[in-house]
């Protein structure tokens, strides 16, 4: 992916870009690895790169010039609508103030990868489902469980045989994804989850057995990377965190069409 990014930032125009790498956790080496690779490749390509630490970052406007500053920086980094690209990394969605910084950059005209709306929709599994549904994409049947007492109504609405999948609306790395094999199990888990957090948001989905899932990255209307994550042995999930193996994956024509439509 980094090689494709390097090609992207050099092919569109000869002038230099100003690149912001926006991260909520720039000091965490494990979580910041991908962002750091963007920094390295951007600099190799001769671009100006600035890491924005969203905690405490501010934007100033003076003499028709916008600058963004980290809390520990007095010099800042000039930004504009004509030459600045922001690559948003890390858990920026965790705080509204972080997202508000993205909104400010968008208002200035900075090219955002990705925008606040995209991040918020992608972080919510049901909003993602609705958004993709708007474009006619094929998806597993999905129903919300709006509160603890409506799980049975939701199950009837799903109208799917067991096993099914239950998920928290937010979560990553396979956390909050549950394999449900009976009514007794779903009732017990719903009660448990609502007991732990009365504001928890849940959905249930039709279970479709597969040997893995496909991840695709689309940039500027082009597919720049694709991979397959194989199901972890003894599990139903294919997340890398619990040990899924990853390999290159050539997309079919239908998959290309669906991915571009989704993007």
Give names to the regions the model predicted:
Residues 17-18, 48:
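Residues at the starts of beta-strands that form the adenosine-phosphate
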Residues 1-17:
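Charge-dense, intrinsically disordered terminal/linker segments
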Residues 189-190, 205, 213-231, 262:
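Beta-strand scaffold of nucleotide-dependent catalytic cores
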Residues 31-32, 97-99, 175-176, 214, ...:
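Short glycine-/acidic-enriched loop or helix-start segments at secondary-structure transitions
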Residues 18-24, 35-36, 69, 80-81, ...:
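Active-site nucleotide/adenylate-binding loops and adjacent lid/helix of ATP-dependent enzymes
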Residues 26-141:
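Conserved N-proximal alpha/beta basic substrate-recognition cap immediately N-terminal to
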